[in-house]
């Protein structure tokens, strides 16, 4: 087994879009005539040793024979000497039909694989999402919440941290209580409503009458008893008043009985 290919195994397991290759000995003499020989170096991880180019190269034939062969091959696609060279990997089915597989470009002697359209879209979307996430994280760091005012923006976070550090060493002044706002009252009402729905108040239970009678009869009886007691109290009070207040007749009789005998009328 070729030991040179063993060293390329870890590189082939990686994403080919992440790697590059160059040979410093070829860079000063690189030109359109030898660019395919440069790309066919054994140390190049992008070159397939089973391609038709390798077969033609081993037979020392011209690359024009590739049009009459079928299989994987490499062809020079674009040349902009001395900086840019583009090489295409394709699968040839017939002399007039070939399917592109990958494109490689050589810039200043360094070989890269050109990304496909799906990789470009994925990279752009990932970059966009990353920057959006960073922007949202930055914006959320300036968001503030107050129970009576709700959410607000505070872009003086550094000043606030500095002032907070200074105030920790000083005695805190008493904070004046502020009246509740409409936002705070609405939030409190909503929280109380949620608590009542989760934990409803128990219904009042009816007490049983121990005598088994009608509650209305019991109430009437108590009223009658109270009325009788009130009447008896009134009667006693009237009798007392009658006893305490003497009548005129009694006063006259008492006056006649008390007259001395010498002053009684003689018949």
Swiss-Prot record:
One BP term from GO: regulation of transcription by RNA polymerase II
Where in or outside the cell it occurs: the entry states: Nucleus
- Where composition is biased (Polar residues), the residues are 205-218
| Renumbered residue ranges of the record's region Disordered | 202-267
Under InterPro entries, the record lists:
Mediator_Med6, Mediator_Med6_met/pln, Mediator_Med6_sf
What keywords does the record list, in alphabetical order? Activator, Nucleus, Transcription, Transcription regulation
One function term, GO molecular function aspect? transcription coactivator activity
Any one annotated GO CC term? mediator complex
- Principal location: nucleus
Please give the function described in this protein's UniProt entry.
Answer: Component of the Mediator complex, a coactivator involved in the regulated transcription of nearly all RNA polymerase II-dependent genes. Mediator functions as a bridge to convey information from gene-specific regulatory proteins to the basal RNA polymerase II transcription machinery. Mediator is recruited to promoters by direct interactions with regulatory proteins and serves as a scaffold for the assembly of a functional preinitiation complex with RNA polymerase II and the general transcription factors.
Write out the similarity annotation.
Belongs to the Mediator complex subunit 6 family.
Oligomeric and partner information:
Component of the Mediator complex.
Protein name according to UniProt:
Mediator of RNA polymerase II transcription subunit 6
- The species this protein was found in: Anopheles gambiae
């Amino acid at each position: 087994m070729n030991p040179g290919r063993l060293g390329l195994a870890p590189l082939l397991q990686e994403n080919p879009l992440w790697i590059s290759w160059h040979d410093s000995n070829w860079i000063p003499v690189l030109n359109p005539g030898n660019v395919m020989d440069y790309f066919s170096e054994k140390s190049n991880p992008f070159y397939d040793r089973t391609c038709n180019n390798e077969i033609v190269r081993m037979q020392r034939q011209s690359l024009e024979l590739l049009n009459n062969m079928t299989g994987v091959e490499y062809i020079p696609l674009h040349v902009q000497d001395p900086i840019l060279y583009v090489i295409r990997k394709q699968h040839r089915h017939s002399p007039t039909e070939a399917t592109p597989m990958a494109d490689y470009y050589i810039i200043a002697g360094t070989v890269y694989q050109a990304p496909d359209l799906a990789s470009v879209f994925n990279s752009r979307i990932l970059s966009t999402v990353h920057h959006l996430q960073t922007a949202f994280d930055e914006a959320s760091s300036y968001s503030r919440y107050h129970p009576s005012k709700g959410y607000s923006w505070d872009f003086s976070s550094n000043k606030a941290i500095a002032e907070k550090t200074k105030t920790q060493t000083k005695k805190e002044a008493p904070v004046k209580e502020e009246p509740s706002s409409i936002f705070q009252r609405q939030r409190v009402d909503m929280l109380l409503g949620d608590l009542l729905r989760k934990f409803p108040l128990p219904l009042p239970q009816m007490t049983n009458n121990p005598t088994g009678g009608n509650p209305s009869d019991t109430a009437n009886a108590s009223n009658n008893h109270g009325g009788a007691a009130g009447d008896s109290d009134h009667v006693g009070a009237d009798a007392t008043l009658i006893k305490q207040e003497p009548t005129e007749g009694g006063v006259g009789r008492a006056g006649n009985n008390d007259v001395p005998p010498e002053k009684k009328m003689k018949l």
